[in-house]
Amino acid sequence: MSTSLAVVRLDRELPMPTRAHDGDAGVDLYSAENVELAPGQRALVSTGIAVAIPHGMVGLVHPRSGLAARVGLSIVNSPGTIDAGYRGEIKVSLINLDPQTPVVISRGDRIAQLLVQRVELPELVEVTSFDEAGLADTTRGDGGHGSSGGHASL
């Protein structure tokens, strides 16, 4: 089942978002500006596009794995969420996590990837307890934040 995504190129000199390989989940987003990020610095970077995410779907903006691994470039609010009703320009909140080296982003560089996925939109129902709602205790209960172990420091 194929879904189409309406894309407006706000900057006609930049290419449409592209998939590097047939079957890739994400499409690459391009920087619409030149930016230099000092170590630890963040910036909201324009992509020059706007999209119309279909109702019942969500756009998720993820870091590009090669940039994260090689130069420490990531996304502050990863993944960034694009709701179906948003029609403005996609901007990416990038951060340089390298402790020593600045990251230079040139206009036209691929800086992130956009995934579009179906999303459940549940009705929120207030309950006074999970037992009352028929959602009895689980083996995990309220354990979180390292409660399952898996690392020597935990």
Swiss-Prot record:
Family: Belongs to the dUTPase family.
Classification via Pfam families: dUTPase
Cofactor(s) required, per the database record: Mg(2+)
A GO MF label: magnesium ion binding
Assembly notes: Homotrimer.
Keyword match Disulfide bond: no
Entry's Gene Ontology BP terms: dUMP biosynthetic process; dUTP catabolic process
Name of encoding gene: dut
Miscellaneous comment: Each trimer binds three substrate molecules. The ligands are bound between subunits, and for each substrate molecule, residues from adjacent subunits contribute to the binding interactions.
Chain ranges passing through the membrane: none
Organism: Mycolicibacterium smegmatis (strain ATCC 700084 / mc(2)155) (Mycobacterium smegmatis)
Protein name: Deoxyuridine 5'-triphosphate nucleotidohydrolase
Keyword Cell membrane: no
Enzyme class: hydrolase
Keywords noted in UniProt: Hydrolase, Magnesium, Metal-binding, Nucleotide metabolism
Catalytic activity, reaction form: dUTP + H2O = dUMP + diphosphate + H(+)
Biased composition annotated in UniProt, kind: Gly residues: 144-154
PANTHER family hit by this protein: DEOXYURIDINE 5'-TRIPHOSPHATE NUCLEOTIDOHYDROLASE
